[in-house]
Curated annotation (Swiss-Prot):
Top-rank taxon, per record: Bacteria
Ligand binding (ATP): G11, R72, S73, G102, D103, G104, S105
Function in brief: Catalyzes the phosphorylation of D-fructose 6-phosphate to fructose 1,6-bisphosphate by ATP, the first committing step of glycolysis.
Compartment(s): Cytoplasm
Protein name: ATP-dependent 6-phosphofructokinase
Upper taxonomic lineage: Bacteria, Pseudomonadati, Campylobacterota, Epsilonproteobacteria, Campylobacterales
Native species: Sulfurovum sp. (strain NBC37-1)
Entry cofactors: Mg(2+)
Pfam families: PFK
Enzymatic reactions: beta-D-fructose 6-phosphate + ATP = beta-D-fructose 1,6-bisphosphate + ADP + H(+)
Amino acid sequence: MKNIAILCSGGDVSGMNAALKRFVEYAFDQGLTPFFVENGYEGLIDNKISKADYSDVAGIISIGGTKIRTSRSERFKEISYRQIALENLRGHGIDGLIVLGGDGSFKGMQKLSDECNDIGFIGIPSTIDNDIAGTQYCLGVDTALNAIRVAIDSIRDTASSFGRAFVIEVMGRECGYLALVSALTSGAEMCLIPEVPYNLEVYKEEFLEEKEQGRTYFIAVVSEALKNTEQIVRWFEEEIDIESRMTVLGHIQRGGIPTVHDRLMAFHFVTSAIDALREGTKSKVVCYDDGMFICKDIKDVAFKKYMIDEDLLALGREFESPQHKQV
């Protein structure tokens, strides 16, 4: 093992630059030559591969996004383009490639691995959705949760001042993790996610009772997976008789200064990935499991459905409980 490369694929997350910094510094520390692949799998096809140096990662640890850029590649789905990508890696003498991304990126990595036996591939879960099976944490999640927290705290100020209901839509793709954790930690009165069935009649009874007792505003957090945010806004106005507003947080959840936790997790993920490559590991994903960083088969990560921890879901079910009273 002499030369290793790294790329970012799919949606960007805060913490990727911290991962790049650790990649360069730890590679040199282990006597390896680090390479950057710009623009994800697209860059792999277009041979945008170059040696990396300390100067390339100076000052980037506190910056969100990724210095080497990312992409979603349609061309990469075709074997002819993947063969070009492999030849480009071989042309630079690359022995191992680290891929930061989600399940789609890992499926692409699996295809590369199946089509060659002379290059090692290791994935690092990187998505704010936190929806990757086999790992309890994905890079970027903590920064995203803190961005959502700041937004909801600010919205609560105006909601309480005007006496309104605010329905806040958060990202997560098909997973309700972001919405659930954000609702719990921001004191929301309603949380709607695909993993927990809900009954609006139960909420109606509780909210009308709270209005009679003097409550003047409500905060609802809704997962984008449900695709019903506008419907919930209308429900508040028609059933609860309160002026309502919708806020779609959108891509502010992806950017921003990485938290200390994401920076530290980036260092751990990359260290484990490089160590795995040096040991001859191929076609694996570094997963965080009960405080440990473990390499797991791609098929156990990219091809399985992520399930939110049952203890966390139990807290989510309490939102419809009459005992669930938030301040």
